[in-house]
Each structure stands twice: as structure tokens, then as C-alpha cells.
């Protein structure tokens, strides 16, 4: 029996299933309750809802972005921006580093959240979210985007966020969008680990046991691929990962790769959609089999000793309720 709990939070619904209830989260250890519960509810929940209306479920609105919180300024976070250029692939990454202003008051190592699709993520980080984080053991924020004024660099993310062909191990045409390349996740991960992360750690001390990676859609594939890679990150948030992409290539990898049992690794799988006023799903491409795929992943991770949980997040017009399947 799967129990799904829907909790109303300003018309957003956060769901934990597979026997994990919201009350359980509220009673987790001090580490989870004070840091990652806040991150989940304030950033990951809102970005999942945002993501559900974007690239995987509906065509993203590719309009130039207004000034973000780093440009406007925040009372709670200081932001730095740095560009990283890869000459071999002619790409320039724009990375925003958000450091809580409490850093000036303490020498503690900080939890950190590395977010993909950084341009879009930064456009939806608001002062009220940063205030809430600041008041609850604020994490360092690292938004990894591209040199563009649009929310997404679709061709670049298609290459960077997806795993290589399982037979050749090389990039190839994206089977979903043949005009783009795919399969460059290993190279992109090296940029993060060898260039971006060291720059972050030169600016602020990070806690190695509290380094989170968040990605949506293709970014969710990158998160899962990074879990299989096993380096650097301790917490993995895969929001609406495109598990059906390329004949379920990521599912095939997960089924075959043997993970080393690491109790310090934690995985959250997240799915979501938006409902219209009439109660119908906004997404025309909603994967009805997505929950079953996530269940299979959870089962595999559980067998290999990786702590994993599943969240279902939906925006709708209804009262709090519990659904059982």
C-alpha cells in the first residue's frame, strides 16, 4: 500500500509517499529538520512546481529574464557571479554563488545546494525565500547557468545534462530533439568538480556531508547520473527526471550499475504537475508511468543501501487530503 499525503502550503501540495509522512520529516534529526527540511519546502518545492510548467510538461516561455535577486540585492545573502568558459566546446557557464550573511558571524562549514538551470532558478529566488533560509541555518546556494539572458540554453543543457550512449560512451544526437547533441554529462560533471566547486570552496567553507545537487527534467537525469558517479555530493534531488528519454537510458544504467553502499548518500525523487482551474493536468506529455519508474528506482536504491524517498508535488485547487493506491 502506498500512502500519499497532500499538504496545503499556500496552494502548493507537497507529497511524501512510500510510508514517509510529513510528520516524520518534522521529527527528523536536527540536521535534516533545521537545514534540508527548509531547503525542500522553500526552494525545491517551489522549483519543482515551477519546473512542472516548463520544459518537460509545457513549452518553456523563452523570454529575456528580468533582473534577479543577485542584481537587485538581498538583505540576507551576498551574491558573487563568475563565468567559466570551456574552449573545447565553446560554452560559457554563468555561476551565481549565494553566501548567507551569517558567514560573517561564524566559521562553521555550511550546507550547500548546487542548482542546475541556474538562470531560471535565480529568476525565481525571491527575498522572502532567502529570509526564511537565513532564519533556518541558511545553506550556500550555487546556481549553475549559461551566458544567456534567457531562462534556458536548450542546446547546451541537452548536451550537458544527459548521459552518453551506453554502447559507444560518446555524445550523439538527442533522440528527442535531433537538432541538438546529447550525452555530455561526464564532461559537464568534470567542469563542476574541477572548476566550479573549487571556486565555491575558495569563497566559503562547505560541509562535505551536506552538499546537495538539484536538477529538473534533463537536469534530473544529470542528478541521477551524478549519484551513480558517486563523487562529491551527499544529497541528490531529481525533480521530474526524464526517465523515458532515449529508450529509458537512465533506467537501464540504474538497473545495471552496482552502487557502493554509502549510508551518507540520500536521494529524493520528485514528480509534479500543474492543474488547471477545471482540474485537468496542464501537461500534455505527463508520463503516467512515472510513479512506477520511480518506485523501481527506489527499490533498486533500497536494495543497494542508498536512502531514497519520493515526493509528489502538485499545484491544484482542493483541500488537504490523503490518497491511497
Report each predicted region and the residues it spans:
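The feature captures the conserved acid-bearing segment of alpha/beta-hydrolase catalytic domains
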Residues: 244-314
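A domain-start/cap signature at the N-terminus of enzymes
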Residues: 56-111
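Serine-hydrolase catalytic machinery in alpha/beta-hydrolase-like enzymes
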Residues: 108-191, 195, 199
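Active-site nucleophile loop of the alpha/beta-hydrolase fold
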Residues: 146, 237-245, 274
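Conserved hydrolase catalytic core segment
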Residues: 225-234
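Gly/Ala-rich beta-loop-alpha elbow adjacent to hydrolase catalytic centers
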Residues: 215-219, 223
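Alpha/beta-hydrolase fold nucleophile elbow
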Residues: 205-216
Amino acid at each position: 500500500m502506498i500512502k500519499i499525503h497532500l499538504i496545503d502550503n499556500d496552494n502548493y501540495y507537497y507529497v511524501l509517499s512510500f510510508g514517509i509522512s510529513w510528520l516524520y520529516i518534522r521529527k527528523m534529526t536536527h540536521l535534516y529538520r533545521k537545514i534540508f527540511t527548509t531547503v525542500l519546502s522553500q526552494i525545491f518545492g517551489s522549483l519543482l512546481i515551477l519546473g512542472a510548467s516548463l520544459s518537460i510538461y509545457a513549452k518553456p516561455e523563452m523570454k529575456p529574464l528580468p533582473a534577479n535577486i543577485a542584481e537587485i540585492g538581498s538583505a540576507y545573502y551576498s551574491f558573487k557571479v563568475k563565468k567559466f568558459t570551456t574552449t573545447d566546446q565553446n560554452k560559457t557557464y554563468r555561476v551565481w554563488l549565494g553566501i548567507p550573511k551569517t558567514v560573517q558571524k561564524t566559521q562553521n562549514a555550511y550546507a550547500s545546494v548546487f542548482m542546475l538551470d541556474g538562470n531560471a532558478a535565480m529568476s525565481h529566488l525571491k527575498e522572502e525565500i532567502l529570509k526564511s533560509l537565513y532564519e533556518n541555518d541558511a545553506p550556500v546556494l550555487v546556481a549553475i547557468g549559461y551566458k544567456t539572458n534567457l531562462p534556458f540554453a536548450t542546446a547546451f543543457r541537452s548536451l550537458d545534462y544527459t548521459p552518453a550512449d551506453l554502447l559507444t560512451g560518446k555524445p550523439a544526437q538527442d533522440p528527442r530533439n535531433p537538432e541538438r547533441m546529447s550525452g555530455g554529462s561526464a564532461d559537464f560533471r568534470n567542469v563542476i568538480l574541477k572548476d566550479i566547486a573549487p571556486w565555491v570552496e575558495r569563497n566559503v567553507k562547505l560541509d562535505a556531508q551536506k552538499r546537495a545537487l538539484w536538477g529538473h527534467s534533463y537536469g534530473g537525469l544529470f542528478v541521477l547520473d551524478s549519484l551513480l558517479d558517486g563523487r562529491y555530493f551527499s544529497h541528490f534531488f531529481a525533480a521530474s527526471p526524464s526517465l523515458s528519454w532515449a529508450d529509458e537510458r537512465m533506467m537501464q544504467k540504474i538497473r545495471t550499475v552496482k552502487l557502493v553502499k554509502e549510508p551518507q548518500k540520500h536521494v529524493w525523487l520528485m514528480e509534479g504537475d500543474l492543474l488547471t482551474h477545471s482540474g485537468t493536468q496542464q501537461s500534455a506529455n505527463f508520463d503516467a508511468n512515472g510513479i512506477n519508474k520511480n518506485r523501481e528506482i527506489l527499490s533498486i536504491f533500497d536494495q543497494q543501501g542508498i536512502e531514497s524517498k519520493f515526493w509528489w508535488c502538485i499545484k491544484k485547487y482542493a483541500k488537504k487530503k490523503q490518497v491511497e493506491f
